[in-house]
Amino acid sequence: MLLDGTINKLDTTQNFFLKTIEGLEEKDGLFKPQDGMFSVAQHIAHTAQTVDWFIEGMYSKAFNTDFDALEKEVFAITSYEVALKWFNDAFERGRSKLRDEGEEALKVRLAPGPIMGGVPRYIVIGAISDHTAHHRGALAVYMRLLGKEPNMPYE
């Protein structure tokens, strides 16, 4: 039951994000409101990377805190399509990992530490959803700046 719920949460998180950004396309990938901000493609790439980061971290001894290296990986992404593939693949990897590890593994507490230390693993799925929603909202603003109407994700 817990496993099904966490997989369902990943599914709805992914689907809400994709529904919202449906009107974006490759030509929008490099758009950013100003220097120093993520582009459309980089927002999507960062969101994908963070899904992978959370899933890897929840089954490891600690989360990767080499944020400079993680940021460089995201800033290298310039294609909307490449970022979108990473996003979809990250969610599929997440679902596969949850299934492979099984329900009981979701109840195991994370090691003490600065990132979600001591919480049961399944709580991490809520953090994935929250983080993804944050970037979904940012991309909705970007879409409006591009003259596009973001979709209501819940339809």
Please name every model-derived segment.
Residues 1-4:
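Basic/polar N-terminal segments that are highly enriched at the extreme N-terminus
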Residues 7-11, 18, 28-71, 112-155:
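Short, contiguous alpha-helical
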Residues 13-23, 50, 90-93:
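Amphipathic, well-ordered alpha-helical segments in soluble domains
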Residues 14, 25, 59-62, 91, ...:
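Generic secondary-structure transition motif, activating predominantly at the C-termini of alpha-helices
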Residues 20, 75-111, 119-136:
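Acidic/histidine-rich alpha-helical segments that form the ligand environment
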Residues 23-30, 97-107, 144-150:
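Surface-exposed helix-capping loop/turn segments at secondary-structure junctions
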